[in-house]
Amino acid sequence: MKRIISAAVTAGFSLLPGNMTAARAADITVLSSNGLKAAVVELVPQFEKETGHKLVFTWGASNLLVKQIEGGEAFDVVIVTPALIKNLVKQGKVVDGSAVDLARVGVGVAVKQGAPKPDIHTVDAFKQTLLNAKAVAYTTAGQSGQHFIGVLEKLGIAEQVKAKAKTTPGGAVAEFVAKGEADVAIQLIPELASVPGVEVVGPLPAEIQTYIVLTGGIGTNAKDKVGAQALIKYLKTPAAISVIKAKGMEPG
């Protein structure tokens, strides 16, 4: 929870037709998975300019964000995995029928900028890369982190990697690589690519890859459901889809 990053991004003019001014447009509070951060941050200024809304973000691992919601955190829009959205609907915290798939993203590998890129094209090569690394960085939270932990067990090297792991419950694990504290980092590709000083080697081999779907939903107690819906619709526009693709994701 400590590593969940909060950020507010500002700008704007007006959302609703006619004479609604920027001064009257409501803030929209968004709790979003780190996986969509690189794309959304780039899209925010234009959305705010067109609508007059200010977007106020809390970024983090999906499961940690849900814990915040279950603890009473107020929000207008939440962007996490479909299963978590479904549970929030059951709890009455997300409007039933408001869920929209926004993006699909895979897990990748990153190294420090300028460092030799290891072979990760096959499962055996990836396994050897992990064994050769002096330190491996990965997250212990979120669907991608849990998937990687499962991969380590499947490959039979969980204990070897755990002994030299650099882990965090949330945030950008590629920072360990950028600072020279780990040789490789494993996380969702957009999260890796967003860290200065690192290079994405590529995705995990197909046999052990997983794709995380990120879904947006509107809070039952959202301050401005119309504004929340406008944001979700904006993230499905051609302009937004273009940015999502450019950040290494597939549109939902």
What are these regions (language model features)?
Residues K2-T10:
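Sec-dependent signal peptide recognition
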Residues A23-N63, K67-G71, I79-G92, D96, ...:
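Exported/periplasmic ABC-transporter solute-binding proteins
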Residues S14-A22:
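C-terminal segment of classical bacterial N-terminal signal peptides
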Residues G12-F13, K86:
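Alpha-helical transmembrane segments and their juxtamembrane interfaces
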Residues F75:
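Dinucleotide-binding Rossmann-like beta1-alpha1 core, especially the glycine-rich loop
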Residues A8-V9, L16, N34:
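Serine/proline-rich low-complexity intrinsically disordered segments, especially terminal tails, linkers
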